[in-house]
């Protein structure tokens, strides 16, 4: 069973009738995702892309049985939308939205504490590419045609580096079980550690490619967890080897501020944890191939 989404997974779009919601809904439908409807307050009862529109996520879940959603709403409304999804029983929610205030992300994470581990919604993002299980379903904004179905899991803070890895692997005949873009913000819904733990128990995943960058302790925390708890091999790439300290590089979370947050330091610490490191982005696929050949 794939991580997070299957071909049958029923999906909602929050912000369904807006420009971005409409565009990516069409792309997801073309890919084969089971999009059963969407939510736009005030437009309940209408049809959009031949699918029902609801005023609330609760109504949408009640009438469609949806278990996954994706947010295409303005940053100011993203926190309330995510919490509404959790309260409605959504199991997996992807927040594509860029620019969500850090205080709002803290509010979401605090709100989610009211749920038990088994009831808690998985939030992926914000500022991310989303999730794709090639050949099954897409809950995101990635170009689906570059993904080949296979048995390597990808986790990436950067959307475009995730795409690059997928394309390289496809050209080498290596497929992907699930690819998850966790986003480049300092505070996100799911961490590297959260996702590699799921891949470890996934019977469709044999190895994991983890694509990180400067800033924050997430990559090293995942490596330390893997060293003590995982058997599946992990390949890593850390972007930002030449990035100076104290300067934001692209993503809001990509800033080196403490020991263990630079690319060089992360690479050394991950090597100590048994992670195989790709030296540069152009050989991510080749590095995965080398690791798989040793299994």
Regions found by a protein language model. Give the residues of each.
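Catalytic-core regions of core metabolic enzymes
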Residues: 1-295
